[in-house]
């Protein structure tokens, strides 16, 4: 983990200025450039990069700050192709930006090797875990965990997660797979049943899918006899349409016999007995599904209406 930043003092600024003036008159760096390593050697606790950034940000006037223009980005891209990562030379050619600005702009935005896809859930969890380990050292997090993303992108993503109050889940849990599975009662039936239900007496070769509504138009229509077990030939069953009762083979004739206690004039209730079946008799043949004309039974009258 890198050390926390320390503000530059007035004494350090004065020493930096003097050392730069010496290097400017007699540069000891490669290709007669400013030797920032030599300058940093005389300022305890400061690296060559710290000295270079402080000098350009503190003493160089006439440089532009803030957002980069499209023209500046295009010019920086061409200069990097030509001079690689020689930021001091690039800054001199840019004229409007210092070396530190050019370096940050390239590594944070313009480098074509940077990963620019949206952050995944796994990456977010890894980022939160890395912050717990490395703190706010974004360069260390980038080097260890996200080499294809810029440090600035990593910092911005953590800021977004913090604003959304997204915290790191326990180590044994994962947000993608630790959600409780729905109960059996809340699960919807599968689109295709594991076994096709069979209708009793259904025709061979016909399929039935209760979840496939499109099969209703293609499935053959079933008649009433398809749902009845096979029976030997039997006489037609007579059904009394008026009284709503089965006769003949069933051996049942409806008799209304109220309790004699309710009728003083007819103690035995014989006056209320209805031996004759009222209404027209219709015979319904369950074998062929046809209604036949009225049938007159011996000893009984059939009323014609």
UniProtKB/Swiss-Prot annotation:
It comes from the Eukaryota. GO terms for biological process: mitotic cell cycle; positive regulation of transcription by RNA polymerase II. It is found in: Nucleus. Residues 198-207 have a biased composition (Polar residues). GO terms for cellular component: nucleus. GO terms for molecular function: DNA-binding transcription factor activity, RNA polymerase II-specific; RNA polymerase II cis-regulatory region sequence-specific DNA binding. Disruption phenotype: Results in a significantly reduced expression of orsA and orsD, and in complete loss of orsellinic acid production, during response to Streptomyces rapamycinicus. Residues 5-59, 60-110, 111-162 form the Myb-like domain. The keyword Nucleus applies. Keywords: Nucleus, Repeat, Transcription, Transcription regulation. InterPro entries: Homeodomain-like_sf (IPR009057), Myb_dom (IPR017930), MYB_TF (IPR050560), SANT/Myb (IPR001005). The keyword Iron does not apply. Residues 175-215 are annotated as: Disordered. SMART domains: SANT. Induction: Expression is induced during co-cultivation with Streptomyces rapamycinicus. Transcription regulator that acts as a central regulatory node for the integration of external bacterial signals leading to the regulation of secondary metabolite gene clusters such as orsellinic, lecanoric acid, cichorine, 2,4-dihydroxy-3-methyl-6-(2-oxopropyl)benzaldehyde (dba), emericellamide or microperfuranone clusters. This is Myb-like transcriptional regulator basR. It comes from Emericella nidulans (strain FGSC A4 / ATCC 38163 / CBS 112.46 / NRRL 194 / M139). The lineage of its organism: Eukaryota, Fungi, Dikarya, Ascomycota, Pezizomycotina. The gene is basR.
């Amino acid at each position: 983990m890198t050390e926390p930043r320390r503000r530059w003092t007035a004494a350090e600024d004065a020493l930096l200025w003097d050392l730069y003036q010496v290097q400017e008159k007699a540069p000891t760096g490669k290709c007669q450039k400013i030797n920032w390593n030599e300058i940093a050697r005389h300022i305890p606790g400061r690296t060559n990069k710290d000295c270079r950034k402080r000098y350009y940000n503190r003493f160089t006037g006439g440089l532009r700050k803030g957002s980069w223009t499209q023209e500046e980005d295009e010019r920086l891209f061409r200069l990097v192709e030509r001079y690689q990562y020689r930021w001091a030379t690039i800054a001199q050619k840019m004229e409007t930006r210092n070396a530190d600005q050019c370096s940050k702009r390239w590594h944070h935005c313009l480098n074509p090797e940077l990963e620019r896809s949206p952050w995944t859930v796994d990456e977010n969890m890894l980022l939160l875990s890395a912050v717990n380990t490395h703190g706010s050292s974004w360069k260390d997090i980038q080097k260890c965990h996200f080499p294809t993303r810029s440090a600035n992108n990593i910092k911005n993503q953590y800021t977004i997660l913090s604003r959304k109050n997204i915290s790191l889940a326990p180590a044994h849990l994962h947000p993608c797979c630790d959600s409780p599975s729905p109960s059996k009662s809340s699960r919807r039936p599968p689109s295709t049943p594991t076994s096709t239900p069979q209708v009793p007496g259904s025709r061979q070769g016909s399929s039935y899918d209760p979840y496939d509504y499109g099969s209703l138009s293609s499935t053959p229509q079933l008649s009433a006899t398809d749902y009845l077990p096979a029976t030997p030939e039997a006489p037609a069953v007579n059904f009394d349409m008026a009284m709503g009762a089965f006769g003949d083979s069933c051996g049942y004739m409806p008799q209304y016999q109220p309790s004699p206690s309710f009728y003083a004039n007819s103690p035995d209730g014989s006056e209320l007995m209805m031996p004759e079946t009222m209404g027209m008799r219709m015979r319904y043949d369950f074998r062929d599904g046809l209604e036949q004309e009225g049938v007159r039974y011996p000893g009984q009258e059939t009323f014609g209406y």
